[in-house]
Amino acid sequence: MQGLHHFVPTDLKAAYINQLLKVGFDTLDFGSFVSPKAIPQMRDTSEVLAKLDLSGTATKLLAIVANERGAQEACQYPEIQYLGYPFSISETFQLRNTNATIAESIERTKAIQDLCTAHGKEL
């Protein structure tokens, strides 16, 4: 969804994810807490989360984060069980995707792991 040029309305995203929640997946990557300048499509992740019906599902939610700021935001939501960090074996892709080298990303994930531990989340 992040590659789409037109903004997908929040209600449509939530309706789609609510349908996926009915399937019974173990884990669902539902959104990202990243800079809206970097990925405008994900600017409404908090609003999408608020519209999800988690009452009849055992599916766990995973949010992608690319830095500590995103991890801090994601950790504020008890509905989110997992945080994901976009790692690549390609230095070029890692830089383009996270604005950090692989070595810097390793350090970032250490800080993100500390946040996860403090908030009962998994990375």
Enumerate the predicted regions with their spans.
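Catalytic cores of alpha/beta
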Residues: 66-78
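Active-site mouth loops of central-metabolism enzymes
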Residues: 1-14, 59-68, 94-102
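Conserved N-terminal beta1-alpha1 strand-loop-helix module at the mouth
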Residues: 1-30, 41-47, 54-58
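Glycine-rich, proline-tolerant flexible connector loops at the mouths of alpha/beta enzymes
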Residues: 26-52, 85-101
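Alpha-helix-loop-beta-strand connector modules within alpha/beta enzyme cores
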Residues: 38-63, 104-123
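Hydrophobic faces of well-ordered beta-strands that scaffold small-molecule active sites
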Residues: 3, 26-30, 59-65, 81-85, ...
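Conserved, mostly hydrophobic/aromatic
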Residues: 20, 74, 83
